[in-house]
Swiss-Prot record:
InterPro entries: Asn/Gln-tRNA_amidoTrfase_suB/E, Asn/Gln-tRNA_Trfase_suB/E_cat, Asn/Gln_amidotransferase, Asn/Gln_tRNA_amidoTrase-B-like, GatB, GatB_C_1, GatB_Yqey_C_2, Gln-tRNA_amidoTrfase_suB_CS. It comes from the Bacteria. The keyword ATP-binding applies. Its EC number is 6.3.5.-. PANTHER family: GLUTAMYL-TRNA GLN AMIDOTRANSFERASE SUBUNIT B MITOCHONDRIAL AND PROKARYOTIC PET112-RELATED (PTHR11659), GLUTAMYL-TRNA(GLN) AMIDOTRANSFERASE SUBUNIT B, MITOCHONDRIAL (PTHR11659:SF0). GO terms for molecular function: asparaginyl-tRNA synthase (glutamine-hydrolyzing) activity; ATP binding; glutaminyl-tRNA synthase (glutamine-hydrolyzing) activity. One of its GO terms (biological process) is translation. It comes from Crocosphaera subtropica (strain ATCC 51142 / BH68). It catalyses: L-glutamyl-tRNA(Gln) + L-glutamine + ATP + H2O = L-glutaminyl-tRNA(Gln) + L-glutamate + ADP + phosphate + H(+); L-aspartyl-tRNA(Asn) + L-glutamine + ATP + H2O = L-asparaginyl-tRNA(Asn) + L-glutamate + ADP + phosphate + 2 H(+). SUPFAM superfamilies: GatB/YqeY motif, Glutamine synthetase/guanido kinase. Heterotrimer of A, B and C subunits. PROSITE patterns: GATB. This is Aspartyl/glutamyl-tRNA(Asn/Gln) amidotransferase subunit B. Allows the formation of correctly charged Asn-tRNA(Asn) or Gln-tRNA(Gln) through the transamidation of misacylated Asp-tRNA(Asn) or Glu-tRNA(Gln) in organisms which lack either or both of asparaginyl-tRNA or glutaminyl-tRNA synthetases. The reaction takes place in the presence of glutamine and ATP through an activated phospho-Asp-tRNA(Asn) or phospho-Glu-tRNA(Gln).
Length: 495
């Protein structure tokens, strides 16, 4: 995310995020129903997820494994003993009239997540650690579909789709360590990177796989007491998170300065009008009347299980960034871009493992290939240019077989059709001319054909060297070694 517009400096925002991550298990958290997205309404349901009397839930072991792995990735404490609780509330899309969640004994507590903030102009990266209060498992609710409107207001009637009921969720609660919309958006993005690297969720905000609620208050700088906390919902992109927070900070500051009350409430982010609007009074935990879930036994995580799950952890984004900077000599910015997506990082590493220069490969991936991916709307695993071929291309440049200019000329064909860069260059006669005698012959012919330019150069107009270098490149179809051509042109022109 780019650097946010600063708010009035005499106030500070206190921000915490509650993030719901939908897991990509094939079955629901307490039954065998499918979790497939976009199935026909009410087809992925059974008596358990619909809350029929007399049925008993059974925990999906994969959900527990995902929770523990994410907890480990967040540098958190994994509880050896935890339990499930019933969170009671009445809503049309909650068939049991309670949600199975975790309250006072969550599976994960006391973690942290380091985020990186990028300055838009300088590309400088600064780091900040955000505390993680807890992470717990719970089941999702169903989905209300409002006919005639995207919200209840203005709709003619509402329908309930229970397919999502019982889909497994992890809720990650941050400490109130966030101070701006930029930090909040980056925190959410880093969480998404983690769940994608772990392979436990696609983290797609548009499809609801990652949902963030923001808790925010403002206070004068130096004041220890918190202001009145407001919750914001309905943000389906990282930019929406940043914009909603920036708007709400300004709204609350204006209210404080005008002496207007700030209510503890839930507000909705209205994307079309770029503002937050009041939705309902905010509930407290006592309103949910939590009590232990009687149909599920307590959870115990043994040291043996914990160690087994630790062994399954991949190299995480922050670890990759550090290795790229320290071992491969990349800038913090390039390391960040390359590790943003696990598939891109794996592509990059495969190319480097061919023996190609790490920095040169990074330049090709973050610039030319990234531009192609952006324009074609493809992922890196969908392009025809395989990482081994990119490594081969970079090594051809390093050895002087081709110039960077020639490499850029054959890149479109490689991206569209794939193949061996070396064979393409040889078949088209595009190998770089690196023989000094051959280049000298071209320069001498040009000097003979342009005596006045030679005289002007020797009279002090040194910029004319560029004219001769350009003509050499033109005569050779861009195949002459640019560095060698510059050296030889200077030598011959100076007589």
């Amino acid at each position: 995310m780019t650097t946010a517009t600063p708010v009035k400096t005499e106030y500070e925002a206190i921000i915490g995020l509650e993030t719901h991550c939908q897991l990509n298990t094939t079955s629901k958290i307490f039954c065998n129903c499918s979790t497939e997205f976009d199935s026909p309404p009410n087809t992925n349901v059974c008596p358990i997820c619909l809350g029929y009397p007399g049925v008993l839930p059974v925990l999906n072991e994969e959900v527990l494994a995902s929770a523990v792995k994410l907890g480990l990735a967040l540098n958190a404490k994994i509880a050896p003993y935890s339990k499930f609780d019933r969170k009671q509330y009445f809503y049309p899309d909650l068939p049991k009239n309670y949600q199975i969640s975790q309250f006072d004994l969550p599976i994960v507590e006391h973690g942290s997540l380091e985020i990186e903030l990028v300055d838009k102009k300088s590309k400088e990266v600064t780091r900040k650690t955000i505390g993680i209060t807890r992470l717990h498992m719970e089941e999702d609710a169903g989905k209300l579909v409002h006919a005639g409107s995207d919200r209840l207001a203005g709709s003619t009637h509402s329908l309930v789709d229970f397919n999502r009921t019982g889909v497994p969720l992890l809720e990650i609660v941050s400490e109130p360590d966030i101070r701006s919309g930029q930090e909040a958006a980056e925190y959410a993005q880093e969480l998404r990177r983690l769940v994608r690297y772990l392979g436990i969720s696609d983290g797609n905000m548009q499809e609801g796989s990652l949902r963030c609620d923001v808790n925010i208050s403002v206070r004068p700088v130096g004041q220890k007491e918190f202001g009145t906390k407001v919750e914001i919902k309905n943000m389906n992109s990282f930019s929406a998170i940043q914009k909603a927070i920036e708007y709400e900070i300004e709204r609350q500051i204006e209210a404080v300065e005008n002496g207007d009350p700030i209510y503890q409430e839930t507000r909705l982010w209205d994307e079309s009008n770029q503002e937050t609007i009041s939705m309902r009074k905010k509930e407290g935990s006592s309103d949910y009347r939590y009590f232990p879930e009687p149909d599920l036994p307590p959870l115990e995580v043994s040291e043996e299980k914990l160690n087994a799950w630790k062994q399954e952890l991949p190299e995480l984004p922050a670890q990759k960034r550090k290795r790229y900077e320290e071992a491969l000599g990349l800038s913090a910015y390039d390391a960040r871009v390359l590790t943003d997506d696990r598939e891109v990082a794996e592509y990059y590493e495969t190319a480097v493992n061919t023996g190609a220069d790490a920095k040169l490969v990074a330049n090709w991936v973050t610039q030319d290939i990234a531009a192609y991916l952006n324009n074609s709307k493809l992922s890196i695993i969908e392009i025809a240019l395989k990482p081994d071929s990119l490594g081969e291309l970079v090594q051809l440049i390093e050895k002087g077989t081709i110039s960077g200019k020639i490499a850029k000329e054959i890149l479109p064909e490689l991206l569209e059709k794939g193949g061996s860069p070396k064979k393409i260059v040889e078949s088209k006669g595009m190998t770089q001319i690196s023989d000094p005698a051959e280049i000298e012959k071209v320069i001498e012919a040009l000097m003979e054909a342009n005596p006045s330019e030679v005289e002007k150069y020797r009279g002090g107009k040194k910029k004319l060297k560029g004219f001769f270098v350009g003509q050499v490149m033109k005569e050779t179809g861009g195949r002459a070694d640019p560095k060698l051509t510059n050296q030889l042109a200077e030598k011959l022109l100076n007589g």
